[in-house]
Each structure stands twice: as structure tokens, then as C-alpha cells.
């Protein structure tokens, strides 16, 4: 939804999963056979998986800054998009599961310590990269920022021994100032607490 709003696309949002409409209906499974969110229908195009949806939106509706036509420039952005989604996000989600999803009596501090070390190392690399900013790949918001930047809301909202990283903090503040980020990313996850 963040990308859809950044691109200024007219859309109809339908909420599915966790307290919303069921994802195991025939109608939803026709959109996403895995029965998970997200799914996107754009005319005759039906997609699932967030990275595929983001790339489709960027390629179809993005301008040259958001989705470069030059393949080498696009690949440079794609590296950070993939790193953000597959490396950084996955690491932050380990802390999310510990801090939010686990019941307090099921928490092991050693698990948090290990996850925090991993996330800290990755966040330091991201802080260094952002030093070239203000965005992940330069002066303009790109699809890489959406693939990587969304997890910063959880990174900063979770209770863990987070390092002080000035470039990363400025980047997060820049993202928070964007209405599409604050409206679509900065949503409460309180109803997920203590699920395991």
C-alpha cells in the first residue's frame, strides 16, 4: 500500500487476514493460492508476494527515479531492495517475534541477544549506506526504499538494545515525514502481542 500511495495510484483496498476477511476462500485463493497477504489485482494482472507486487508497480507506474530504465542503475537499486527484504527485514522480524509474538514467559534473553547482535551489524551497514542519502540510493525515493524502509517502523518501535545510528535515524525521520509511509506502515501491531 505504501508504494501504491507513493505512486499516486487510484485503488480500492480490501483488508484480508488477521481480524479481517478470510484468506482461505475460493475468491481469495484465486488471487493468492498460498492463502496469505498480500495480493494485487490490476486489471487482468493478479499477483502475490510483496517483492513481485512492488516490482510490477514500479515497472508499470514508476518514473525514472523510482524505477530506472537503465538496467545497471536498476540493478544497483535492486541489490538494496533485496538486501532490505531478505536480509534486514528477516533479521528485524526475529526481534519482532521475540518482543511481540512470544508470551513473556516463553522468552529467552539469549535469543534476543543473538538477534540484537545480528540486527545491529546489519543496521550499521545500512547506516553507512544511508550516509550517501538522504534515501537508500541517493536523493530520491525509489522502490528500494519501500522494500527496505518499511521495516524501520518495527526496528524503532520494538523494545531492544538498539544502537545510536545517526544516518539511519535521519532516514527513518525522512520516511516518517512522508504521508504514504505514516498512513500505511506506521500501523499498530498490538493485537499480535503474546500469540505464542
Annotate the PLM regions:
Residues 1-113, 134:
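GST-like domain detector, emphasizing the conserved glutathione-binding G-site
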Residues 8-10, 166, 193:
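Compositionally biased amphipathic helical and low-complexity segments enriched in hydrophobic
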Residues 14, 50, 165, 185-186:
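Residue-level detector of family-conserved "landmark" positions at structurally sensitive sites
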Residues 17, 143, 188-189:
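Short, solvent-exposed turn/loop segments enriched in Gly/Ser/Thr/Pro and often Arg
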Residues 22-23, 174, 194-195:
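Short Asp/Glu-rich motifs
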Residues 81-179, 184:
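GST-like fold's C-terminal all-alpha helical module
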Residues 181-196:
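Terminal-tail/helix-coil boundary detector
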Amino acid at each position: 500500500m505504501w508504494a501504491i500511495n507513493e505512486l499516486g495510484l487510484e485503488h480500492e483496498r480490501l483488508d484480508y487476514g488477521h481480524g479481517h476477511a478470510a484468506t482461505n476462500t475460493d475468491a481469495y485463493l484465486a488471487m493468492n493460492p498460498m492463502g496469505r497477504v498480500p495480493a494485487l489485482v490490476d486489471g487482468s494482472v493478479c499477483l502475490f508476494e510483496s517483492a513481485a507486487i512492488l516490482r510490477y508497480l514500479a515497472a508499470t507506474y514508476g518514473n525514472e527515479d523510482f524505477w530506472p530504465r537503465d538496467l545497471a542503475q536498476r540493478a544497483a537499486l535492486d541489490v538494496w531492495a533485496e538486501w532490505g527484504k531478505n536480509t534486514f527485514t528477516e533479521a528485524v522480524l526475529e526481534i519482532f517475534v521475540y518482543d511481540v509474538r512470544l508470551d513473556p514467559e516463553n522468552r529467552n534473553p539469549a535469543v534476543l541477544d543473538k538477534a540484537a547482535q545480528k540486527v545491529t551489524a546489519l543496521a550499521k551497514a545500512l547506516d553507512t549506506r544511508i550516509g550517501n542519502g538522504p534515501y537508500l540510493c541517493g536523493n530520491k525515493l525509489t522502490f528500494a526504499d519501500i522494500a527496505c524502509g518499511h521495516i524501520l517502523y518495527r526496528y524503532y518501535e520494538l523494545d531492544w538494545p538498539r544502537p545510536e545510528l545517526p544516518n539511519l535515524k535521519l532516514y527513518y525521520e525522512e520516511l516518517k515525514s512522508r504521508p504514504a509511509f505514516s498512513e500505511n506502515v506506521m500501523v499498530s501491531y498490538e493485537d499480535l502481542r503474546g500469540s505464542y
